[in-house]
């Protein structure tokens, strides 16, 4: 088992995949979760998050069209992250920037990954599409159908038990 781990940690393909996942987390996942958690804390209606979900898709398209805003050593979190805030793990980002020249397929894999993520994002958020039911709903209708910004209350066995008890 140790040899497998050693081999994986010294495999260019594995390193490339891990670097792509980590930089995606820094650019999209962490900022998204921070925003959704903030919306939950503010008791914001999930049905009002359509514009934010469109922003996520647009941000992924921006990186697809110009991945250098994310992977050059002079890249700024101001344009590279979804929220324009500092990196969650700046040391990880710097390490990835150092590794990029040694990973010959990094940029292509990054763009391919972001394209797949954007396609999936569009499919998962289709109910927020302009002209759709949620987009066309009035504020009163959205209030009547209010939903929390996260599904945390229903996650896991404890969440299911809690829901059952109420």
Which role does the model predict for each range below?
Residues 65-125, 129:
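Low-complexity, serine/threonine/proline-enriched polar segments
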Residues 8, 19-27, 35-39, 80, ...:
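A sequence-composition feature that detects small, non-aromatic residues
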Residues 4, 45, 65-66, 85, ...:
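Detector for Asparagine
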Residues 1, 101-166:
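Amphipathic alpha-helical/coiled-coil segments positioned at domain termini
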Residues 5, 9, 18-21, 47-49, ...:
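Generic detector of leucine side chains in alpha-helical contexts
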Residues 1-76:
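A eukaryotic "domain-edge + linker/cap" signature
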Residues 18-21, 25, 29, 49, ...:
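Generic preference for well-ordered alpha-helical elements
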Residues 28-31, 35, 59, 63-67, ...:
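Generic recognition of well-structured, leucine-rich alpha-helical segments
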């Amino acid at each position: 088992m140790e040899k497998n781990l050693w081999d994986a940690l010294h495999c260019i393909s594995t390193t490339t995949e891990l670097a792509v996942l980590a930089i995606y987390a820094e650019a999209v996942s962490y900022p998204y979760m921070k925003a959704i958690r903030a919306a939950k804390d503010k008791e914001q209606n999930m049905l009002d998050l359509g514009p934010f979900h469109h922003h996520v898709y647009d941000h992924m398209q921006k990186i697809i069209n110009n991945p250098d805003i994310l992977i050059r050593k002079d890249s700024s979190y101001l344009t590279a992250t979804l929220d324009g805030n500092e990196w969650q793990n700046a040391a990880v980002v710097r390490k990835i920037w150092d590794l990029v020249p040694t990973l010959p397929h990094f940029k292509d894999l990054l763009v391919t990954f972001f394209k797949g993520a954007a396609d999936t994002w569009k499919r998962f958020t289709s109910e927020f599409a302009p002209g759709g039911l949620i987009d066309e709903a009035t504020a009163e209708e959205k209030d009547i159908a209010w939903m929390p910004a996260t599904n945390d209350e229903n996650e896991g066995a404890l969440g299911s038990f809690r829901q059952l008890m109420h």
